[in-house]
Amino acid sequence: MKTIKTTVVAVTLLASLGGIQTASAEVSANVALTSNYIFRGVTQNNEDPALQGGFDWEDKSGFYLGVWGSSVDFGGDESTELDFYGGYGFDLAPGFSADIGLTLFKFFGGDSASDSDVEEAHLGLSYAGFDLYYYLGLSDFDSDTIELSYGFDITSDIGVTLTVGDFEDVSDFYYSAGVSGPLGYGVDWDLTVADADEGNDSTQVAFSISKSL
């Protein structure tokens, strides 16, 4: 679900040179390499490395649009995932914010890859490091997800994120724990351990390096 105007697309392409700002909006880009693409407790690429990256446009009013991609391996035709998303974030009170939006998860790689396409709507609430999100499956995909995460710093450079959730009829209950920090030169690292009731033969581990542009 992507409704970016031509002028915004042109600005987005320039973002590969670094984060830039317009009069009322900011465009940024990111790229990452991970040893294992994990989504809601389940590996999305058969525990193999994945190259990932995306672009984001955010207006000062709170509206945002973005696209993010990754290599995937589900054992079928799918080889590439592209997520198109948009939404609106706003403050409810000092330190208390909300986020509403839509995401299209689109898959490429073969004749039947598009059969895995999924659309979701989401509603999120954030306060004091806690994020509570509800994801509503749309179209033929009606599995809903509720997720709670908490992020905090243990030093000035090192952060921790703890997540629990329930992905109805897919991974069911899942959890993850991640620690992240800077490597230098604008490059960050992240180590995540995750598991789920369904969809994995073992606990998943991922080490990632990323850079925002």
Predicted features and spans:
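Outer-membrane beta-barrel proteins
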Residues: 2-213
